[in-house]
Structure formats: C-alpha cells, structure tokens
Amino acid sequence: MRLSRYFLPVLKETPSDAEIVSHQLMLRAGMIKQEAAGIYAWLPLGHRVLRKIEQIVREEQDRAGAVELLMPTIQSADLWRESGRYDDYGDEMLRITDRHDRDMLFGPTNEEMITDIFRSYCKSYKDVPKLLYHIQWKFRDERRPRFGVMRGREFLMKDAYSFDVDEAAARRSYNRMFVAYLNTFARLGLKAVPMQADTGPIGGDLSHEFIVLAETGESEVFCHADLVEMGAPGLDVDFDGDLQPLVDQRTALYAATEEMHQPEEFAAVPADRQLSARGIEVGHIFNFGTKYSEPMKATVQHQDGQPRPVHMGSYGVGVSRLLGAIIEAHHDEKGCIWPESVAPFGAGIINMRVGDEACDAACETAYQGLVKAGLDPLYDDTDSRAGAKFATADLIGLPYQLVVGPRGLKEGKIELKVRRTGETHEMSPEDAVSRLAEGAFSDV
C-alpha cells in the first residue's frame, strides 16, 4: 500500500478526553473515530489490526474443534423470557420494538439463541458433543463507557458454546477452550493468566477469567508470580487427548480476581512470589450445567431412552478489547510496538527524497520485493518532512522500517530499523528485503 493513497488521519496532539495509553494511541494513529459515547468507527489502520486479531482467534477456535456459525444481532425477547433473563438483565440490554409491536433486543450475549438452535436439531446423545462459535458485534449500554475500546458500548466478541451429555463431558469441552485461549493469547503477544472468577449473570459453578496485567486494568488481581511466566501449551496440543494435566498445571497455583480473592490462601504463597496488580480481562469461560437447557427444554435422549437436559458451557473473547490490551502491553513514548502477528503492515518504506530518481527507483524495487515476499509493506511516498515520516512510522508501529535516502544510496546502502528494539542496520536494498523475507529480525 502506498501512503499517498491510504487513509491515515493521524493526530499531532493527544485528545484530552483519552485517559489511557491505548485510547490515546488509537486516536492519534487514526485507528478509530468516536461517533457516540462508547461507539467507534474503525478506520482502515485499526480495521486491519482488528481483522488480524479476529483471524488468530478464529484459527485457534478451529484448531480446538469448534465450528463457526453466525447468529443475528437482533434477538426475540421471547427467548430471553423463556430462560428467565429478560427482566433480570437490567439496563445494559438495548430493548427495541419492531413495527408489529413485538419486543426485540440487540443481543448482549447469545446463550438463549444458541440453545434454541441446538434444541431445534439435536435430539439424541449421539448428536453431542457440539462446540459452536461465532464472531459478532455486540451492544451493551454501559452506564459509563470509558477507556476507548476497552469499555465501549459496541464491541466485537467471539462467543463459543458447548453442549455435552453430562458433567464429565462438559468439563472436557471446558478444558478445550481453556487450552485454546492460552494459545490464542500467546499468539497475540500477550501473557494472560487464568484466574478463578465470579460467574455473574451468566451463571454456573465453574469460571475463569483470562487476565493481562496492566496498570490501566479495571480491577485488582492476585496471583502466584510464576503464572505470569508460564508458557502456552503450544500449537501441537492434541485436543482429543487428556487436557486435564495442562489445565491443572495452570490452576494449581493461586490466582483470583478481586471478587474471588481469598486473603488467607494468598498469604500461603511465598512472599517473594505474591503478585498483586491491576488486570485487563480479555477472555471469560463458564461451565453452567443445565442453567439454560433445563428451562428451555434443550434435551437429548440418553441410551436408556430418557430425555435429559444437556450440559452447557460458554466461552467469550473480547476481540476488539484485545486490540486495546495489546497496545497497553506493547508501546513506548513514540507509539505502538505491535507483535508481528497483528501488525497492520509487515514493514514500512520511507522515501527520504521523493522525486529523486535513485531514491524512487530503490524504493519501488524494495516495495515490489516486499510485496512478492508477502510482507504487505506500507510505502511512504509522500512529500512530508523526514521527521514527520519517522514519527508516523513509529506511531502506527511499523515493525521494520526501510529508510531510503540519497546519501546512503551513493554507497549502495539503506537503513533498516527494527521498531521493537530500536536497532538500525545498514545494508543494500536487496539484502534488506531478503533478510526480512527470511525472518532474520523476527520476534517469533
């Protein structure tokens, strides 16, 4: 992509109403534009990152054996009355009436609808287990939206739901999502700690939140410090095997959100390993048994011929919130430092003297080489000042920046800057392209 053709409305000043770093940088880098309280338009740069995050979430759901579908955003109130949650959910639910005076709602979550879908088609124990997910925009009318996409009213969510014949099978589905989430967040460059959590209005008796530690986190969390450095299970996990040991390894040490915190248990953690910090919730999983299947009569016939309610679980990831969490974890005073897996562009080319025949030719050659290598470069072919070009490249987080100027080209060299470390290397344009293509400076 050539910057002269791209839509990148960067801001020179930080908006005064942006309280946290991720909100500030997303506005300054031209990633989002606020349209109403807690509601944002996703501009091209932000949309590119969002789609990359979404794709990683999708790939890890697929790897774990989940099957994607898509449910509508507008739901019938009748389903929520059937489960008993229509009157209980509160003012966060946006309730609407259609032209026929039928009560509808903009879905804040999908337990009722997915249960209705399941019960319409699955009648036998042979029809389970099932693990279904979708990625869709949600709306919750937050009383006080703040922190940009971290606590907005409209947000992109991945919701997965499991259906199993009994509690033991439901726990196996829970473990699948537990492990899938660890791998997902690791691929996004995040160290997410699973913590015992309150089930809230979703219900159930087993729940974990996945927390990324950050000073701007919405709540206080408590954990054994070893959990922060514990690596992800890895992409070669056998999801059809016994995952309980992997889950046990990551739940044996103390970790709890503020609501579930037990001070006496935390005191038993060695003093030098006690960690109390602020945290950002990026995922939440629940095992809620027959809370929805029983009132909604989602049953399957067992081998003894008797119908029984299926055991269910719910597994959510805030896809749009993840973008903010990644920035909170990866930034400096100059701007975003994206993990390569979600960087909006694979590299940047900065032409220091547009119109100079040698510079233009070298940039064009490098651009075509990076495109051929699949690195999706952003070529700054504008006539902006050099300082402004460097500032923009750092602000939006171009992971590798090829700086092409007439002085270096006289010696057949350009400068390659690694955004993550600040290191610079001088080499020929051809070497720069080939080394980037082979991942010589990769953070993976």
Swiss-Prot record:
Gene3D superfamilies: Anticodon-binding domain, Bira Bifunctional Protein, Domain 2
Catalytic activity line of the entry: tRNA(Pro) + L-proline + ATP = L-prolyl-tRNA(Pro) + AMP + diphosphate
Subcellular location: Cytoplasm
GO cellular component: cytosol
Cited Pfam families: HGTP_anticodon, tRNA-synt_2b
Enzyme class: ligase
CDD domains according to UniProt: ProRS_anticodon_short, ProRS_core_prok
Keyword flag Nucleotide-binding: yes
MF GO annotations: ATP binding; proline-tRNA ligase activity
Known role: Catalyzes the attachment of proline to tRNA(Pro) in a two-step reaction: proline is first activated by ATP to form Pro-AMP and then transferred to the acceptor end of tRNA(Pro).
Entry similarity comment: Belongs to the class-II aminoacyl-tRNA synthetase family. ProS type 2 subfamily.
HAMAP family reported for this sequence: Pro_tRNA_synth_type2
Protein name as it appears in the record: Proline--tRNA ligase
Species assigned in the record: Maricaulis maris (strain MCS10) (Caulobacter maris)
Upper classification of the organism: Bacteria, Pseudomonadati, Pseudomonadota, Alphaproteobacteria, Maricaulales
